[in-house]
A protein has these predicted regions:
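Active-site environment of non-heme Fe oxygenases that use a 2-His-1-carboxylate facial triad
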Residues: 1-21, 33-140
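Active-site donor-binding segments of glycosyltransferases and PAPS-dependent sulfotransferases
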Residues: 27
């Protein structure tokens, strides 16, 4: 799996959670693993059925920490998403003046360079569920 400034994201069409995690762990150290879906009406946007504006993961957490006089110190070099349950919600990508949109289905994955490529979401999340892994890159 090769991410570069010219190709800051990779789409994987057919995989399973086990193989996905094994490949992602080769890229670095996980700093957080979570489930993204529509679980409520309050809190983080990643757990609500709502559009999400283009962003780099960690921006919201850093802003919320700063509001409380705290710091957010997790490194999120790579964002890895595995689709546990598909849906109609569109994942939007934006990098270096380019854009792409993908509707993830079960067994598909996205690996995104979180320093180059912003992402967002539009459309109804419904019961779509993603496994999200934040990765701090291995020293190169």
């Amino acid at each position: 799996m090769y991410l570069s400034p010219e190709n800051p994201w990779v789409f994987i069409d057919k995989t399973n959670a086990d193989d996905f995690l094994k490949e992602v762990l080769k890229l670095g150290k996980p700093t957080e693993v979570s489930i993204v879906g529509a679980f409520g009406k309050e809190g983080r946007g990643s757990t609500q059925d709502m559009d999400l504006p283009m962003h780099f993961d960690g921006e919201y957490s850093a802003r919320k920490a700063a509001e409380k006089g705290l710091t957010f110190d997790k490194k999120i070099d790579i964002l890895a998403l595995y689709c546990l349950k598909g849906g109609d919600s569109v994942t939007l990508l934006e990098w270096n003046g380019n854009t792409a949109s993908i509707i993830l289905q079960t067994g598909q994955a996205l690996i995104i360079d979180n320093k180059i490529c912003r992402h967002g979401r539009c459309g109804q999340v419904g019961d779509r569920m993603l496994l999200r892994v934040w990765i701090e890159r291995n020293n190169e």
